[in-house]
Curated annotation (Swiss-Prot):
HAMAP family: Chromatin_Cren7. It comes from Sulfurisphaera tokodaii (strain DSM 16993 / JCM 10545 / NBRC 100140 / 7). One of its GO terms (cellular component) is cytoplasm. Pfam families: Cren7. It is found in: Chromosome; Cytoplasm. One of its GO terms (molecular function) is double-stranded DNA binding. It comes from the Archaea. A chromatin protein, binds double-stranded DNA without sequence specificity. Constrains negative DNA supercoils. Methylated at multiple sites, to varying extents. Keywords: Chromosome, Cytoplasm, DNA-binding, Methylation. Belongs to the Cren7 family. Monomer. This is Chromatin protein Cren7.
Amino acid sequence: MIGMAEKKVKVKTPSGKEAELAPEKVWVLAPKGRKGVKIGLFKDPETGKYFRHKLPDDYPV
């Protein structure tokens, strides 16, 4: 369920800026028997802090 991806996504960083970043890790977060959401782990280029953000449904896992 955890994959690596290179496709860039427009996300809002913790510092409040919009940036186009590629997630370092992608996984699906889903309750049993229901459709899940895709979550990506991103690294803020300015501060170096990691943060999570929801990805579009058509994003490859």
